[in-house]
Amino acid sequence: MAEAPQVVEIDPDFEPLPRPRSCTWPLPRPEFSQSNSATSSPAPSGGAAANPDAAAGLPSASAAAVNADFMSNLSLLEESEDFPQAPGSVAAAAAAAAAVAAAAAAAATGGLCGDFQGPEAGCLHPAPPQQPPPPGPLSQHPPVPPAAAGSLAGQPRKSSSSRRNAWGNLSYADLITKAIESSAEKRLTLSQIYEWMVKSVPYFKDKGDSNSSAGWKNSIRHNLSLHSKFIRVQNEGTGKSSWWMLNPEGGKSGKSPRRRAASMDNNSKFAKSRGRAAKKKASLQSGQEGAGDSPGSQFSKWPASPGSHSNDDFDNWSTFRPRTSSNASTISGRLSPIMTEQDDLGNGDVHSMVYPPSAAKMASTLPSLSEISNPENMENLLDNLNLLSSPTSLTVSTQSSPGTIMQQTPCYSFAPPNTSLNSPSPNYQKYTYGQSSMSPLPQMPMQTLQDSKSSYGGMAQYNCAAGLLKELLTSDSPPHNDIMTPVDPGVAQPNSRVLGQNVLMGPSSVMPAYGGQASHNKMMNPSSHSHPGHAQSTSAVNGRALPHAVNTMPHASGMNRLTQEKTALQVPLPHPMQMNALGGYSPASTCNGYGRMGLLHQEKLPSDLDGMFIERLDCDMESIIRNDLMDGDTLDFNFDNVLPNQSFPHSVKTTTHSWVSG
């Protein structure tokens, strides 16, 4: 046991052994341990001790030769791989290593014989004579490595100790190629390739089961699909896996097909590819922006796409953005200070809110709607807006239909000149035309009385405060029943009686035909849609009496004319008054006894709105006022408008609209 450290001291001389052993993970030496127990330098002592007969029976010269051959071959292979540039030095190093190995083997055998098998002195003698033979092989050793390398190359696992893979230098692609070439038809299925690997490659012999084959089988599948040298051919039989064949045209193999993975790992290549893609995208975007000014490109873009939100596409968004009634939207156009519902009131859109959807057809045929909804007229009304401090200016009638949203909005106070009907009427200046909310028509006086279906209720009737009506009742005018007898008590409303003088002519259906009424419809309709409960729309006028009996309800004076108007007013009141004067068209502006325009049937629309001759409303109101109405001796029209911007005379104190000078 004292010489055991000597064996350990000899180990540092085997520097080629620990170095390749630390560099290559498949240990090469255990393969030769089966040939002899004395193959490894530390093991001979234990091996010989354990098997003294074997140690004694085995010639020491042969053991030394085996050790010398193995060490020389191993060291030669290692040095040839590590230092391929110096073949001369490789041979010298191999010779030196072989000599050291032979000496170590001889010393080991000699030690064994001397220490453990002292009686067998002959063991020491055969060993020294056998030492010259190892130098002989050493002298012949340079030609030996090719043979040894060839024999090792036959086994895939031992092609080189510095091999790339555990089974040798062959890659998966090389193994697959050999497998396919070994087949008779030069084609194999995937399962057949697996079988060939397990049978032909020693490394995979014990790795054929499912647990240990997942890794290398996955690698084979990866290489089959990665390399272009392998092609997949559909199998003729149904349900059978495809054939894998070698590409007859010759595909790339080796490391070049790995450019995909390399491009991801190699930042320079990946950055280049991304840079090219970014440049291409930028060029496409710049091309689109450059062509964005052309007329054709405006239609090529999808207007709802986020990329199309350029300045020239805001008009597309502004068409439906205001429908959200968002006051915060800057695209929705002018925000009306009157009501939030009127944000969208534009050219020709007023009728969509004045009339319910059921009356859309009739409303679309009204030629005056475009004029009514003229924003200039609306702005003129707003300019003349006068907020009265009178507490009763905006009193909402309680009899108004429940659906009607009466808002105490600014009242249009049209103070007429004192020259109207030659009588100063201070109370008349209190006539306020409050703006009602844009409620759908079912709450509006679109309905005429019982049988007058041709009148579309006062589009813009003017609210008169109940308190003001009382004041007018107490004025010089004769009692209201002298002028209009309440025909329909069910419709009559106590506070909204048509006073002889203050019958506010809500521009009801036909009133556009009556001079200034048309201008009122044009002015007031978009903004002030009469409160049905409060609008004194006594536009019931006998058409034949238009030039003479236009329901000119005198306000303070003009009582002498009431007698002339009684017959014209009282007779037709029980029924809707037909205005037959203008061409005989019969949209009658009816009032229900108390001058309440169409309050009888507010819960529903006229059944024949489509049959109304609304298209005739486009007649020249100016000519009618001046030619027909001014011819009547009983009429005293004054064209000195309080609202000069309004293109309608409103100083006439008729029960119709035109005295809307207030």
Swiss-Prot record:
From start to end residue, where is composition biased (Low complexity)?
A: 33-62
Q: Where is the composition biased (Polar residues)?
A: 316-333
Q: Which SUPFAM superfamilies match?
A: Winged helix' DNA-binding domain
Stored SMART domains: FH
Marked site (DNA-binding) residue numbers:
165, 172, 232
Where is motif Required for interaction with SIRT1 found? 469-473
Phosphoserine occurs at 219, 225, 241-242, 256, 263, 294, 305, 326, 329, 332, 336
**Annotated compartments:** Cytoplasm; Nucleus
- Where composition is biased (Basic residues), the residues are 271-282
Q: Which residues carry this modification: Omega-N-methylarginine?
A: 258, 260
Q: Where is this region: Disordered?
A: 1-62, 122-165, 241-342
Q: Which GO terms describe its biological process?
A: apoptotic process; autophagy; cell differentiation; cellular response to hyperoxia; cellular response to insulin stimulus; cellular response to nitric oxide; cellular response to oxidative stress; cellular response to starvation
**Which domain of life, per UniProt?**
Eukaryota
* Chain ranges for the short sequence motif Nuclear localization signal as given in the UniProt record: 258-260
Tissue specificity field? Highly in subcutaneous adipose and visceral adipose tissues. Levels higher in piglets than in adults. Also expressed at lower levels in liver and muscle.
Q: Tell me which positions the record assigns to the signal sequence.
A: none
Annotated Gene Ontology cellular component terms: cytoplasm; nucleus
Share the record's PTM remark.
Phosphorylation by NLK promotes nuclear export and inhibits the transcriptional activity. In response to growth factors, phosphorylation on Thr-24, Ser-263 and Ser-326 by PKB/AKT1 promotes nuclear export and inactivation of transactivational activity. Phosphorylation on Thr-24 is required for binding 14-3-3 proteins. Phosphorylation of Ser-263 decreases DNA-binding activity and promotes the phosphorylation of Thr-24 and Ser-326, permitting phosphorylation of Ser-329 and Ser-332, probably by CDK1, leading to nuclear exclusion and loss of function. Ubiquitinated by SKP2. Ubiquitination leads to proteasomal degradation. Ubiquitinated by STUB1/CHIP; when Ser-263 is phosphorylated.
What is the role of this chain? Transcription factor that is the main target of insulin signaling and regulates metabolic homeostasis in response to oxidative stress. Binds to the insulin response element (IRE) with consensus sequence 5'-TT[G/A]TTTTG-3' and the related Daf-16 family binding element (DBE) with consensus sequence 5'-TT[G/A]TTTAC-3'. Activity suppressed by insulin. Main regulator of redox balance and osteoblast numbers and controls bone mass. Orchestrates the endocrine function of the skeleton in regulating glucose metabolism.
Q: What is this protein called?
A: Forkhead box protein O1
Q: Which organism is it from?
A: Sus scrofa
